[in-house]
């Protein structure tokens, strides 16, 4: 079954679920249906399970072993100044390109998603009071990137994205 939610709504739900998971690792099961009521008009459940998707994205992020400390601190500093969007996108794009240059078999879109998740996780650990301000810009960054959107939709949607 397809979800009745739009791609944008699904992305928002996934980013918020990841954020909750990173801020409260012991509450992962409790946040399973954080913002995602998933029944289609027929009343049947859909295949969009935010907990599974967030778990796959976490595994994907765990594959990224690049240096995040300086980049994360820069994003945090800009977030405090209210300038999250541009620096977040520049940081994710730069780290993704660097990682792809080191591993020619890695698709840029996978690297982009992995770096995004890992950066969110790292920021949640070192600046939990600020990381919540990154969720909306990160959602917008993913939704607004045509290549990432096409990659996810080419997989059959978020629910078919593999780690």
Swiss-Prot record:
<dbReference type="GO" id="GO:0006915">
    <property type="term" value="P:apoptotic process"/>
</dbReference>
<protein>
    <recommendedName>
        <fullName>Bcl-2-like protein 15</fullName>
    </recommendedName>
</protein>
<keyword id="KW-0053">Apoptosis</keyword>
<dbReference type="InterPro" id="IPR036834">
    <property type="entry name" value="Bcl-2-like_sf"/>
</dbReference>
<dbReference type="GO" id="GO:0042981">
    <property type="term" value="P:regulation of apoptotic process"/>
</dbReference>
<dbReference type="GO" id="GO:0005634">
    <property type="term" value="C:nucleus"/>
</dbReference>
<dbReference type="GO" id="GO:0005829">
    <property type="term" value="C:cytosol"/>
</dbReference>
<dbReference type="InterPro" id="IPR033543">
    <property type="entry name" value="BCL2L15"/>
</dbReference>
């Amino acid at each position: 079954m397809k979800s009745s939610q739009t791609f944008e709504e699904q992305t928002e739900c996934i980013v918020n679920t990841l954020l909750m998971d990173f801020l409260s690792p012991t509450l992962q099961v409790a946040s399973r249906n954080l913002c995602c009521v998933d029944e289609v008009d027929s009343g049947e459940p859909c295949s969009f399970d935010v907990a599974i998707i967030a778990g796959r994205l976490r595994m994907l992020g765990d594959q990224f072993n690049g240096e995040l400390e300086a980049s994360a601190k820069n994003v945090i500093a800009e977030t405090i100044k209210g300038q999250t969007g541009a620096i977040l996108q520049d940081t994710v794009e730069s780290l993704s390109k660097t990682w792809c240059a080191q591993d020619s078999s890695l698709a840029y879109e996978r690297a982009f998603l992995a770096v995004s998740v890992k950066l969110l996780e790292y920021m949640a650990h070192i600046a939990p009071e600020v990381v919540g301000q990154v969720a909306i810009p990160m959602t917008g960054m993913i939704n607004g990137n045509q290549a990432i959107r096409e990659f996810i939709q080419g997989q059959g949607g978020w629910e078919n994205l593999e780690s």
